[in-house]
Amino acid sequence: MLGLVLLYVGAVLFLNAVWLLGKISGREVAVINFLVGVLSACVAFYLIFSAAAGQGSLKAGALTLLFAFTYLWVAANQFLEVDGKGLGWFCLFVSLTACTVAIESFAGASGPFGLWNAVNWTVWALLWFCFFLLLGLSRSIQKPVAYLTLASAIFTAWLPGLLLLGQVLKA
């Protein structure tokens, strides 16, 4: 399931970057954010509530919900026409959570996938922190955040998702 989720996280991050660069409208980007938010939430609920759920899948589901809720909130903001400050502060919470996951991942990393996972969580922590600065504190960093979002889309989600789905990369 990781490959599936990462492929669509790559898509949503790519389109969010294009939106941040002013190339598409907020209402257009809401569609992919809603779709990926719902998809991620469904995967998270499966991981949490399936008959085979254990501590590992509970944790994976809880962390996946951080992504799902972020995308659903981005989608909602496009229709609520709010300034995004609440989402920005949520991004700070998620960034701090992602930092702890990154540290834990580096400490327990074994093999290429473990290292890749730790680096991903580090990049995601940085990305969410940048969204806190952009939205929560209204910093004028939209263009650099757009490019970081684009790089994150490609290297932490889209390409790894494709590699996992093609069974070139093993989780």
Curated annotation (Swiss-Prot):
GO terms for cellular component: plasma membrane. Keywords: Cell membrane, Membrane, Transmembrane, Transmembrane helix, Transport. Its main location: membrane. It is a multi-pass membrane protein. InterPro entries: AmiSUreI_transpt, AmiSUreI_transpt_sf. It is found in: Cell membrane. The chain crosses the membrane at residues 1-21, 29-49, 60-80, 87-107, 118-138, 145-165. Belongs to the AmiS/UreI family. Possible transporter that might be responsible for the adsorption of amidase substrates or release of their hydrolysis products. AmiB and AmiS may act jointly in to a two component ABC transporter system. This is Putative transporter protein AmiS. It comes from Pseudomonas aeruginosa (strain ATCC 15692 / DSM 22644 / CIP 104116 / JCM 14847 / LMG 12228 / 1C / PRS 101 / PAO1).
